[in-house]
Every structure is written in C-alpha cells, then in structure tokens.
C-alpha cells in the first residue's frame, strides 16, 4: 500500500489529463520542427496587474535578414468546456488594418506600413467580414475562457517585449483543443456557423486604440500554422527592409 500522501503513477497521469502541459509541449515541438527557436517556462511582468506570469511558449523565427526579432507568443488552452465562436462582421473602410505589437522604436514605421502588413500576414482572406471578437459557447457563469485567452496572449506579448534590448515584434497566438466556429449573419438575420481550424481576430485591447491581431488555432492545425508564420514572418521582414527599415538583427534572443 502506498504511504499516506503518496500518489501513484496512475493518479498523476489522471491529473495530467486535465492539465495543459501536453498541449504546450506539442505546440513548442511543432514550432521547433519548422525552424523556430521555441522556449517554454519564460516569464513576463503583466503590465496590468504587475504580477509575474508564465508564458506557455515563446517561438522566434530564425530569419536570414530582418529589421527586428519576430516572435510568436503563445497561450495554450486545454480542456475548454464549449466550442469557441469567432464573431465576424462587416467593418468600415480601414478598420481591417492593424499593427503587430512591437518595441517603441518600431511602432511608427509599422503604423505607416499597416496596409502592407494586413496584406502580408492574413490568415483569413484579407476582406470583409472581419473577425473582431471571440466567445466560449454553451457555458454557465460569467467566466469566458476564450475572451480571457485573447487578453492573456496579448498581455504576454507586450510583457515579453518589455525585456527586449533590440527592435522586436510579437504576434499573440492562442492554441486550443476545442472546436472553432465563425459566426456571421445572412440578409435575413439568420446565424451562419462555419467550423474552421484557425482564424485571425482583429481585437481592440482594453486601453489600446488601434486593433491588433491574435491568431486562434486548433490543436490539429498548429504545425500548419507554424509553417505559415515562418514564411510570412520572413516576407514581412523583407518588405519592411524594402520600405526603408534598416536590417538590424541576424540572431535569436529567446
């Protein structure tokens, strides 16, 4: 008989089944397979709460040339109760534009190139309707894990860049092991649901004016998304250099 307080392997494995460690490991490995330098267990100072928080995965793409270090800062959410529903709507002209989270010196040039960025880094086709919000469906209570995940991912991206000593860009990513649906409405007001593997939500953070983008990706599509981001991050770096940003970095800092 195990001593009192002792946990068997079976008990620990049962406990692990309800944690997100496996999803974090899979995500980090997927990005490593595509040439990213991926790190787990890094921390940041939450700019809102001033508390130290752990980041699930930080993945930096290894670029041949770039004006900045470019990271995917990833929040993993396992064990969601309900599907996540991504709301899409027609937006006024220019509201589909966004800029990545960046260090201060890059904010102005990225703002100038926001139309280029929206074209280079799409997940959905770069046209209306645009994904603008996310909610966890069929849950009880006020807690919304989907909205909370977007907030945590963007906070982690901003917190991570606070420590950056060189020009840096961060794209928040949320990886989830629950179904994803987009929600639109037809001309009669009837809801239209479509299941998908990933989407980009153009989200207005509390206290921030311009929209930023958060990629939401199902567990089964992480490898595909890492492959896509690697290509698009290099393309972004090349285009920003073409538009006058100096080539400044050639090595990783994760």
Write out the residue ranges for each language-model feature:
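Intrinsically disordered, low-complexity Ser/Thr/Pro/Gly-rich regulatory segments
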Residues: 1-254
């Amino acid at each position: 008989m195990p001593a009192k307080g002792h946990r068997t392997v079976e008990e620990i494995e049962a406990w692990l089944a309800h944690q997100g460690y496996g999803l974090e490991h899979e995500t980090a490995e997927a990005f490593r397979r595509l040439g990213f330098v991926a790190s787990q267990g890094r921390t940041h100072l939450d700019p809102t709460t001033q508390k130290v928080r752990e980041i699930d995965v930080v993945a930096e793409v290894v670029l041949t040339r770039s004006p900045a270090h470019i990271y995917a800062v990833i929040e993993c959410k396992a064990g969601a109760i309900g599907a996540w529903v991504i709301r899409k709507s027609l937006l006024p002209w220019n509201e589909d534009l966004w800029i990545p989270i960046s260090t201060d010196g890059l904010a102005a040039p990225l703002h100038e190139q926001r139309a280029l960025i929206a074209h280079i880094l799409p997940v959905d086709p770069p046209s209306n309707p645009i994904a603008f919000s996310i909610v966890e469906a069929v849950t009880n209570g006020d807690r919304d894990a989907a909205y909370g995940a977007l907030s945590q991912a963007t906070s982690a991206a901003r917190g991570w860049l606070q420590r950056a000593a060189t020009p840096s860009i961060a794209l928040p990513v949320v990886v989830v092991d629950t179904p994803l649906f987009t929600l639109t409405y037809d001309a009669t007001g009837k809801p239209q649901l479509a299941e998908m593997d990933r989407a980009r939500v153009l989200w207005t953070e509390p206290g921030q004016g311009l929209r930023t983008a958060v990629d939401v990706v199902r567990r089964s599509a992480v490898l595909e998304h890492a492959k896509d981001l690697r290509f698009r991050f290099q393309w972004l770096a090349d285009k920003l250099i073409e538009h006058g940003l100096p080539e400044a970095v050639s090595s990783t800092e994760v």
